[in-house]
């Protein structure tokens, strides 16, 4: 492996010690991308396509170096040249491709599939400005764009592009890839679709306001654009269809290249629909299969064996639904298919609450997923039980075999190996390194639960971490805090319906 000094000599014609932190960051970016690409390989004929409106992947440099087994080596080489890997990591902008638990779940599954050597790629959109950057000015929130794409980034521009037709215009998608490294595993891909016609100058200076009607120029500017008006709501449908249409065309191309005859699509692909944003992939795939010669009934059967749905919403009334006239305007080609899907459900089940189009002419996206997919999962056991017992009980009675639970843990390679090296060292010493690939191995720690020496070391490690946090708070916030403080830390944007609100009220009460 060519190490950092050699890369700096080659790229900048000077040694590592003479490079700026920025130069070293870009050298490491090149090196990591090259090494990750070498771990790609076709693995068997079947592949998972994980379609999601968001992927909260976090900064990638440290994560990729850990997964490639290079973090310690690179850190030592940088230290020998008088450089600090922590300062270099700070230079990397965080990809603005996700927001919350839904996006983190997607990123965790990609990480996990690559680590388990499973063939599974992500499919999403290449947002340029993310959700928004939150700043407070005189106690009021100001939203500003959150750009992250630079000339050199983790994005790899491909030659893959597909036409995507809406009711009133056709755009051409362009696919960008980000490599997803597994821990000592394979490299998969996150496919992100974009448009070459995007125009960032549509955004009004320092705000997140823009012309929501110019679809060819605004399509991938923001994640979840403001939907408080009709143009914003329509834009969300444009975004969703753009993602699934380009994604469906990619999936069919890849499967056909492996020998799929379309009748056997389910032997080549499984499509995981992460929440309801990608639901239109179901009617879109049916449309494409019919266009390519399958009859409608068979196309529906094939797609139903290929798609699965992850539910994130506990309340039935909060599930995504769109007026028929919105869909007729944006994706008129899908409405006849959605009507056929609804008709099939109505013929089979008298219960109106499970139909797809209700009497107010509203299309219920989750209902498409449940009827025309082979699996419905919740994301925590209590959540799944509530879905089965109350919120989706009508569907559970029809399809008990479809409902299952998938609880997501944490990606401990980031939150333990990288964030807490001292604790990692202690664990290695106590139980070996198997836990780095199999979290169940952490149960071996129970043998030490009464070991005073081990418990003392845990307290020491925790205290040292609190001292580091106090130093950071003093440097960045100008606040001096005692390391004996109890810290309750929440690292999301401040939000009006999250636990932070309760915390703020509680603090104002006790102080």
Report the location of each language-model feature.
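A conserved ligand/cofactor-binding region detector
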Residues: 1-510
């Amino acid at each position: 492996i060519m190490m950092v000094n050699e890369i700096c000599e080659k790229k900048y014609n000077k040694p590592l010690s003479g490079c700026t932190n920025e130069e070293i960051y870009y050298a490491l970016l090149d090196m990591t991308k090259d090494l990750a690409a070498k771990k790609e390989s076709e693995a068997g004929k079947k592949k998972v396509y994980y379609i999601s409106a968001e992927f909260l992947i976090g900064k990638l440099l440290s994560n990729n170096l850990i997964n490639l087994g290079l973090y310690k080596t690179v850190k030592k080489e940088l230290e020998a040249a008088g450089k600090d890997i922590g300062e270099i990591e700070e230079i990397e902008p965080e990809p603005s491709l996700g927001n919350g638990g839904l996006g983190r779940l997607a990123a965790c599954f990609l990480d996990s599939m690559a680590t388990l050597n499973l063939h599974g790629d992500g499919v999403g959109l290449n947002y340029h400005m993310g959700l928004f950057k939150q700043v407070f000015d005189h106690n009021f929130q100001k939203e500003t764009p959150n750009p992250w794409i630079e000339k050199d980034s983790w994005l790899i521009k491909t030659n893959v592009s597909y036409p995507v037709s809406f009711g009133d215009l056709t755009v051409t998608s362009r696919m960008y890839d980000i490599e997803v490294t597994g821990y000592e595993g394979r490299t998969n891909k996150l496919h992100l679709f974009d448009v070459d016609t995007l125009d960032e100058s549509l955004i009004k200076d320092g705000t997140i306001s823009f012309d929501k009607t110019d679809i060819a120029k605004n399509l991938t500017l923001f994640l979840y654009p403001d939907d408080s008006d009709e143009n914003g709501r329509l834009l969300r449908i444009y975004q969703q269809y753009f993602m699934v249409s380009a994604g469906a065309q990619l999936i069919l191309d890849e499967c056909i290249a492996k020998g799929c005859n379309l009748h056997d699509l389910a032997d080549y692909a499984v499509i995981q629909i992460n929440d309801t944003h990608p639901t239109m992939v179901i009617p879109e795939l049916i449309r494409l299969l019919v266009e390519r010669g399958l009859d409608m009934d068979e196309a529906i059967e094939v797609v139903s064996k290929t798609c699965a749905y992850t539910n994130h919403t506990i309340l039935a009334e909060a599930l995504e639904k769109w007026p028929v006239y919105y869909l007729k305007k944006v994706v008129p080609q899908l409405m006849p298919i959605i009507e056929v899907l609804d008709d099939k459900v109505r013929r089979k089940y008298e219960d109106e609450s499970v139909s797809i189009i209700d009497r107010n002419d509203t299309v219920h996206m989750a209902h498409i997923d449940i009827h025309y997919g082979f699996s419905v999962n919740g994301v925590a056991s209590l959540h799944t039980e509530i879905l089965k017992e109350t919120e989706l009980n009508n569907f559970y009675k029809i399809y008990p075999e479809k409902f299952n639970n998938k609880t997501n843990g944490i990606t401990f390679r980031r939150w333990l190996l990288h964030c807490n090296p001292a604790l990692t060292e202690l664990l290695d010493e106590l139980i070996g390194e198997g836990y780095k690939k199999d979290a169940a191995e952490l149960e071996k720690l129970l043998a030490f639960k009464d070991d005073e020496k081990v418990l003392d070391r845990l307290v020491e490690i925790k205290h040292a971490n609190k001292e580091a946090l106090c130093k950071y708070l003093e440097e960045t916030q100008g606040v001096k805090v005692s390391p004996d403080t109890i810290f309750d830390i929440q690292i999301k944007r401040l939000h009006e319906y999250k636990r932070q609100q309760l915390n703020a009220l509680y603090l104002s009460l006790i102080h």
